[in-house]
Amino acid sequence: MELYTYYRSTASYRVRIALALKGLDFTAVPVNLLVPAGGANRQPEYLAINPQGRVPALRTDEGELLIQSPAIIEYLEERYPQVPLLPEDLVARAQVRGVAAVIGCDV
């Protein structure tokens, strides 16, 4: 797997945490978001990966490209269930997703 990431991106950090908790190997592909030093996320090469020009983006082992940290983490949870990130209880799962939504949308 390849994770297109920026070290100061909280969205990328969430995915890196999920990958680490699951013990999954990945290659970090740094995307410099700063202009004028970087702005790599606005270059045609990266826009072909994520047309929104945002990080993170994940290229799976099968070659599929995924964007948006909640979707990537959900994919990891379903694709690699051996080390679950979510509790088994339905209500507890919903509560965890609620907290994740607050963090992702409101923080």
Go through each PLM region and give its residues.
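GST-like domain detector, emphasizing the conserved glutathione-binding G-site
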Residues: 1-107
